[in-house]
């Protein structure tokens, strides 16, 4: 995994604009992937960012880069707790819920629909998706409620990714790109 791939997939989380990003990471050697994640956690942990493999298959890891403190806050809202309880999450706290999510990812081939709650999707949009409502627009996720706010968020994420990729290419390292928080 390269830092370029990390920035392309996770710039909004590195910038502190969202809780987490999820991306598939091809690898040739499982131990090399885990070593890279350990190194990344040493470098970014002091900024409040962690990377964990949620699922590792033959040649691809599913990596979740996130801000634990923000995940804790996101998942503690009443609407998130209600949605998560529908899927058997009886956990309080981000790390316990993350463990449950990883277990669900390993047990099923498809993505668990509640995964959006771990990626800063609004709970009302996750619920709209689960209820098969007609969506208002599609960007980083399917939007079922506040279309204008979502479009602004999509534009912020896109601009952030563009700026971060440019800064990385100019030689700014990932630690300097990562906002503390």
What is each residue range found by the language model?
Residues 111-137:
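Hydrophobic/aromatic-rich, well-ordered segments within soluble, folded domains that form packed cores
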Residues 90-95, 123, 138-139:
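Short, surface-exposed acidic
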């Amino acid at each position: 995994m390269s830092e370029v791939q990390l920035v392309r997939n996770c710039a909004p989380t590195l910038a502190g604009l969202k809780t987490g990003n999820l991306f598939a990471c091809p690898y040739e050697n499982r131990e090399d992937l885990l070593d890279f994640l350990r190194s990344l956690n040493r470098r970014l942990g002091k900024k409040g960012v962690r990377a964990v493999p949620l699922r590792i298959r033959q040649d691809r890891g599913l990596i979740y880069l996130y801000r634990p403190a923000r995940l804790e806050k996101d998942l503690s809202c009443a609407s998130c707790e209600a949605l998560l309880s529908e899927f058997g999450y009886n956990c309080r706290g981000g790390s316990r819920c993350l463990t449950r999510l990883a277990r669900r990812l390993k047990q099923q081939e498809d993505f668990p629909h509640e995964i959006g709650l771990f990626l800063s999707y609004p709970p009302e949009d996750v619920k709209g998706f689960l209820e098969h409502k007609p969506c208002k627009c599609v960007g980083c996720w399917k939007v079922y409620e506040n279309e204008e706010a979502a479009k602004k968020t999509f534009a912020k994420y896109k601009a952030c990714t563009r700026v971060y990729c440019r800064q990385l290419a100019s030689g700014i390292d990932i630690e300097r790109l990562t906002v503390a928080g």
